[in-house]
C-alpha cells in the first residue's frame, strides 16, 4: 500500500469499499478493498486463482486490473480509474440516451463481453453501475469475474448472482447452469434501459421480477422453451401472459435494433444470441 497515497473513498461496491488514490507518479487508480466474509479465515485460494486470471484479461472495454495486494487478512485490487458510470449518466439523461450514443455503448459492451466469454470468464453481475465511462465516450466493464472469485456477498445461494433487474429468467427459476447467456440477458436489459431511460423490468422481489418479464415477453411453456418445466422454481400455474409487441414498450428503437434486442431477451437461454454473433448484427452496420 506504500505505493498509493491520497486515499479518498468514492463508493461502496458489492465486494467492499472503493477508494481513489494516486501512485508516486501522480497517476490515479481505483483501489477496491475486498470485504472478506470470514475475517479469521483469510483469503480463499480459489479467489486468488480467479483474480490471477483477471490480470490476464487485456481489452480496451474492460477495466484493467493493474495490481493485487494481498496480506494474510486483506485483499486490495488496483484498477484503472474512470470518473463516471452508466447509471449516473442515465440518471441525468431524461428519456434515454441519443441513439448514436446508445449504439456506441452497446457495441463496446458487447466487444468486452465477447472477449471475456472467449476466455471463458463470465461476469454474472452486469448492471449500469459497473459500466464505467470516460470523457472520450469509452465504456469499460468493471468487476468482471469477481462474482466467481468471491461469490455475491450477503446471499447464501449460489444461483443469486445478478442484481434483480438484470437477472435472467432461467436464474430466477433456479437454474444452476451458469453460462454466457446469463450475461447476454443482462446486456439486453441494459440496452433497453439506454434507449428508454428507465429499467425495463424493475422488480421488487424474485417473483415480481419474473412476472414483470412474463407480462412483457409472455409466459414460457414447453413449446417455446422445452426445458423450462425442469427448472426448480417453474410453476405450471404461472399466470399465462401473451407477449406484447416490442414497439409498445420500446420508444425510439428502429426495426433492426428491436430485432437485436429480441434475440438477446429470449426467455430460453439456449436461444439467446451470443456476444460474438451480436457484434455482426445489422444494427451496427447502419448509421444512426
UniProtKB/Swiss-Prot annotation:
The protein's Enzyme Commission number: 2.7.11.22, 2.7.11.23
A GO biological-process term: cell division
UniProt-listed Pfam families: Pkinase
Alphabetical keyword list: ATP-binding, Cell cycle, Cell division, Cytoplasm, Kinase, Magnesium, Metal-binding, Mitosis, Nucleotide-binding, Phosphoprotein, Serine/threonine-protein kinase, Transferase
GO-annotated cellular components: cytoplasm; nucleus
Binding site for ATP: 10-18, 32
CDD domains membership: STKc_CDK_like
Residues recorded as bearing Phosphothreonine in the entry: 14, 158
Active site per the UniProt annotation: 125 (proton acceptor)
Regulation of activity: Phosphorylation at Thr-14 or Tyr-15 inactivates the enzyme, while phosphorylation at Thr-158 activates it.
Family: Belongs to the protein kinase superfamily. CMGC Ser/Thr protein kinase family. CDC2/CDKX subfamily.
Protein name: Cyclin-dependent kinase 2 homolog
Native organism taxonomy: Eukaryota, Sar, Alveolata, Apicomplexa, Aconoidasida
